[in-house]
Swiss-Prot record:
InterPro entries: Metallo-B-lactamas, PQQ_synth_PqqB, RibonucZ/Hydroxyglut_hydro
Gene3D superfamilies: Ribonuclease Z/Hydroxyacylglutathione hydrolase-like
Name of the protein: Coenzyme PQQ synthesis protein B
UniProt GO BP: pyrroloquinoline quinone biosynthetic process
Task performed by this protein: May be involved in the transport of PQQ or its precursor to the periplasm.
UniProt keyword Transport, yes or no: yes
Species per Swiss-Prot/TrEMBL record: Rhizobium meliloti (strain 1021)
Domain of life from the UniProt record: Bacteria
Gene: pqqB
The keyword Transport belongs to this UniProt entry's keyword annotation: yes
HAMAP family: PQQ_syn_PqqB (MF_00653)
Pathway: Cofactor biosynthesis; pyrroloquinoline quinone biosynthesis
Similarity comment: Belongs to the PqqB family.
Keywords: Plasmid, PQQ biosynthesis, Transport
């Protein structure tokens, strides 16, 4: 491992599925994001990029917006006729906003795709993903808590977090909060630092809290501020927990749960278009007053 390297993390997309603004939504946040004078910038869908040397990168979740994300972030752009600094992609679940970008990466470019067996089967069972040339795209199945390296010198593990199967696999009422291969977090260790990426989490458990404690940085599920946010805004009928996402605020919320764990930097990502923390106001002030940061496209963290 190169001890002199920085662990460099770029938030490629800070929004949840649909982005901000969502194509068919006229909520307050989406209307503001369409107005250049509002100060609320549009945000793309959920993804991070990580590097140790600024040359080779791994991407966590392949957003439908990955072409735009590469365009917006110079370190990810090609440096010769046919080239990409993206050496690998790691999937944390099988949601559309984390898979669809794989189709954009189909243009005869080599990279390694890491996922659990359950998420890997979603990819292999869908013939549309055959556009990823198997001679160029190597698919690696990672067991829960198995050590692997998405980049040279970057130690990683996938670990189970409470969640559910993707929406398109639901058959009736899904089991909520189950821990298995369908929803995982990502643990990273390099340069003496320990970082976690958990874009989807249904609830905090004792084992998850113990894992996150004393981390240098945690990028965590910030989908909804309140559990009934989509119902109150008239944009949906489901609670956050029904969708597999613990709310930020309220009993059992992540604001209180993470605040107890002595985490150096706490950063919300995967933020829904309806979430009031996108704009100035009391909700954002409460989050920031507790020492949390609100992720945004292009945000860079160096450790």
């Amino acid at each position: 491992m190169n001890k002199t390297s920085d662990l460099r993390i770029i938030v490629l997309g800070a929004a949840a599925g649909g982005g901000l603004p969502q194509w068919n939504c006229g909520c307050r946040n989406c209307a503001m994001a369409r107005d250049p004078a509002s100060g609320l910038r549009p945000q793309t869908q959920s993804s991070l990029a990580v590097s140790l040397d600024g040359e080779s990168w791994t991407v966590f979740n392949a957003s439908p917006d990955i072409r735009q994300q590469v365009q917006d972030n110079c370190p990810l752009q090609p440096r010769r006729l046919r080239h990409s600094p993206i050496e690998s992609v790691v999937l944390t679940n099988g949601d559309i906003d984390h898979l669809a970008g794989l189709l954009v990466l189909r243009e005869k470019q080599a990279f390694t795709l890491f996922s659990t067996g359950a998420v890997g089967r979603i990819v292999s069972d869908n013939p549309v993903f055959q556009v990823l040339d198997p001679e160029l795209v190597s698919r690696k199945t990672i067991e829960i808590d198995e050590a692997f390296s998405p980049l040279s010198g970057l130690d990683a593990r996938l670990f189970a977090v409470p969640g559910k199967v993707p929406l398109f696999l639901e058959d009736g009422e899904p089991d909520l909060g189950i821990e298995g291969e369908h929803t995982v977090g990502l643990e990273l260790e390099a340069t003496g630092r320990r970082v976690y990426y958990v874009p989807g989490c249904a609830m905090m458990t004792d084992s998850l809290a113990a894992r996150l404690r004393d981390a240098d940085a945690v990028f965590f599920d910030g989908t909804l501020f309140s559990d009934d946010e989509m119902i109150l805004t008239g944009t949906g009928r489901k609670t956050g927990r029904r969708m597999g996402h613990m709310p930020i605020d309220g009993e059992g919320g992540s604001l209180d749960a993470l605040d107890l764990l002595n985490i150096r930097r706490k950063i919300y990502v995967h933020i829904n278009n309806t979430n009031p923390i996108w704009r100035a106001g009391s909700e954002r002030e409460r989050v920031e007053a507790r020492g949390f940061e609100i992720g945004y496209d292009g945000m860079e963290v160096r450790l």
